[in-house]
Amino acid sequence: MADPPWRFQNRTGKMAPEHKRLNRYGTMTLEDIMALPVAEAVAPTAHLYLWVPNALLLEGIKVLEAWGFTYKSNLVWHKVRKDGGPDGRGVGFYFRNTTELILFGVRGKNARTLAPGRSQVNFIASQKREHSRKPDEQYPLIEACSPGPFLEMFARGPRKGWTVWGNQSDDYTPTWNTYANHSQSHKEPATRRPSRKAKA
């Protein structure tokens, strides 16, 4: 899984002002992100969950392919308020964004999701936290749908059972328990759940 520090630019090639004022971390150019040797660091058969802003969808596809993966589907994160309504505090030139995307790609043979993934809806609804921080619900979803080992690039905190790479990964201790009290992924009700041990 990766959440790159995307650089937003307007049509003049400069950083868009609505993103510049919110920028609280260093960014990378598209070329630099594409050049990361991800293909050398992952297994021959692997899944990629790549976070990408709505405005940079095409750039996200380019990165996914540059890292040696083929796009298959996506997951949508819907940012909501405490009352469950859409959180309209996001930025956007054409629309006020209340969603972000995870592009799902695969590489290698027999790379289908595990059995739980075939009943997992591609939708997460949760409240926003710190700037650019993604929802905790992604972790159990990925762990249920994809075989390990698990790697998080551009990580902002440690995660049990994961290898984390990121300049903030040693500086933050997530409060998983408290966050779980007010945020949950959206799943369709089911009378029977597939076993997490099932093979793809």
Predicted segments, located by residue:
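Class I S-adenosyl-L-methionine-dependent methyltransferase catalytic core
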Residues: 1-200
